[in-house]
Amino acid sequence: MKALVLEEKGKLSLRDFDIPGGAGSGELGPKDVRIRTHTVGICGSDVHYYTHGKIGHFVVNAPMVLGHEASGTVIETGSDVTHLKIGDRVCMEPGIPDPTSRASKLGIYNVDPAVRFWATPPIHGCLTPEVIHPAAFTYKLPDNVSFAEGAMVEPFAIGMQAALRARIQPGDIAVVTGAGPIGMMVALAALAGGCAKVIVADLAQPKLDIIAAYDGIETINIRERNLAEAVSAATDGWGCDIVFECSGAAPAILGMAKLARPGGAIVLVGMPVDPVPVDIVGLQAKELRVETVFRYANVYDRAVALIASGKVDLKPLISATIPFEDSIAGFDRAVEARETDVKLQIVMPQ
């Protein structure tokens, strides 16, 4: 099958590619479904593998198919699958854990060391015409949720995970540092989770303008205003209940404690490329609770339900739809990191 293949750092190709034992090739297991891929989002991790050839200790040592934010249509079901049928429109959770692991038994399968996650070396991704996937990690899309929205469930699930880790109370005020795609997802999940107001801070005014179109969102351009002073003014000097750090930027991480109220929460979502300093005393002096986020667990069905309900509208965050045959150009556009782009999506031939 033709696939978008990362041959090596900085080199992509569209070519026939055999994926041994999975992602569309091989035999269908009794608990699997075969899916005709429809829409695949371009994620920052895909782009990072393209430009750097690695993320942390995950290194691309051999050609790898990219893509993990996906939706499609079921075209075959395994003999034991009962909740899905041929023709169902679905989205797919891309990380498959070992169900017998201690992490999975604890319900934290996202941190299972044995998890097999699409487009994370050595596991191939889903930018192929068909994939085989466990039915247990495949979710039917309601009729009012499009394929494009279905492919947005994966990044929104990270926002859902962050909102759950924050333990939001109704009426909380939150700050999100970083208005990239994940920062925007976190902001919308925080609103859906009960926050009365979410303040989003970034350097890029075009991104702030996009997220500011949502009710309940206020924005601060930190090129123009001091963030700590602005948050203090917005909260009568008390500070926000929750800080979601989504930029991974060292200055933002160092300044987190100044934004939070005493007894508030810090949720670390963004991933710094290198180790960064943290103001431990600043955290201690306010007895701030610190939470971390790595992917997600047990939130996909909730994410789909929120989108279907209309309480979360992700369509304005889709900046462009790119045909599969132009996907290399799409990735090159993603590398440009245009300030007006949030999510680029690739549509597969049908």
Swiss-Prot record:
Chain positions recorded as Zn(2+) binding sites: C43, H68, E154
Q: EC annotation?
A: 1.1.1.9
Give the cofactor note text: Binds 1 zinc ion per subunit.
The UniProt keyword set, sorted, is: Metal-binding, NAD, Oxidoreductase, Zinc
Q: Which Gene Ontology MF annotations are present?
A: D-xylulose reductase activity; zinc ion binding
Reactions mediated catalytically: xylitol + NAD(+) = D-xylulose + NADH + H(+)
PROSITE patterns in the record? ADH_ZINC
Q: Which InterPro entries match?
A: ADH-like_C, ADH-like_N, ADH_Zn_CS, GroES-like_sf, NAD(P)-bd_dom_sf, PKS_ER, SDH-like
**Cofactor(s) named in the record:** Zn(2+)
Family assignment from sequence similarity: Belongs to the zinc-containing alcohol dehydrogenase family.
Query: Which protein, by its recorded name, is this?
Result: Putative D-xylulose reductase
* Species for this entry: Agrobacterium fabrum (strain C58 / ATCC 33970) (Agrobacterium tumefaciens (strain C58))
Taxonomy-wise, where does this protein's organism fall, top ranks first? Answer: Bacteria, Pseudomonadati, Pseudomonadota, Alphaproteobacteria, Hyphomicrobiales
